[in-house]
Amino acid sequence: FVRVILTLISLLVFSSCSTNGISSNQIGKSRFLFLQKELPNISEKSDEISSINFDDQSKVIIWMHGTDRPAIAGNLDCNDDMPPESLMLAANKLDISLYYLCSNATDSGIKGSFIYKRVLELEETINLFNEAGIKPHNIYLSGFSAGGWTALMAAKAIPRKFNKGVLFAPAFAGPRYETRFFPVWRKIIRPKQVKEIIKAEKLEFLIFAYEDDPFNRPIELEFLIKKDEPFPEIVGYSCKKGHFTYRKDCEGKKTYERIIKFFQASEF
């Protein structure tokens, strides 16, 4: 019943956003899924960040999708892993633009390097938003799987470039069951990146993790928790949907409410 209500609300929300720069039918590139209300001078090229005149109060969430296999580019249509209803509804309610950052970064022979490339892509995108008028404290990150992991790595690499973020099943280095076949990923490369992440000055993230996730269950993400620090907040549960729970979230209403509360704590 709750999911039906959320779906109906989302249909109303996104039909009402058609004049706010939604470009969901434009695939093949990074793009705005929707823009905040009443932005001036919206052009047909509104997917170009530089074409929009943001004001001092403008806010944006940068969404980062997952990576299937880092050896090859796999998101050529730039339409994989769209944000969940909970995030889109929250962004719309709070009048925050939502931007889909498409990446086809690959390892190019150096295992794990695709994550660093994705962090660089993120930094370049943030710089464009800065030039368009959005300050770092009004930039938020969100992502699924490797997109969420990219946000964690960004907390160490570019901590002053964004405010905080909401992550869904952040993961890197493949599922646990592949460890015996490809041990280098989870025994060498993942620990190396974990060491980098935990050196971050702050990890202000709301993280949704799933007990039946073959990649990272809540317990595999406990390395993020620092004593006496309120964040990151890890919300763990199971909908029997594994890694892709965020798509059909049995706790969708609670997820939405948590996201709203998390963002509202940012002096909205």
Can you name each region flagged by the protein language model?
Residues 229-268:
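C-terminal catalytic histidine-bearing segment of alpha/beta-hydrolase fold enzymes
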Residues 1-20:
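Classical Sec-dependent N-terminal signal peptides that target proteins to the secretory pathway
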Residues 88-108:
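Conserved alpha/beta-hydrolase
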Residues 17-59:
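A domain-start/cap signature at the N-terminus of enzymes
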Residues 170-236:
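The feature captures the conserved acid-bearing segment of alpha/beta-hydrolase catalytic domains
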Residues 111-132:
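Alpha/beta-hydrolase active-site loop
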Residues 137-190:
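Primarily recognizes the serine-hydrolase "nucleophile elbow" in alpha/beta-hydrolase
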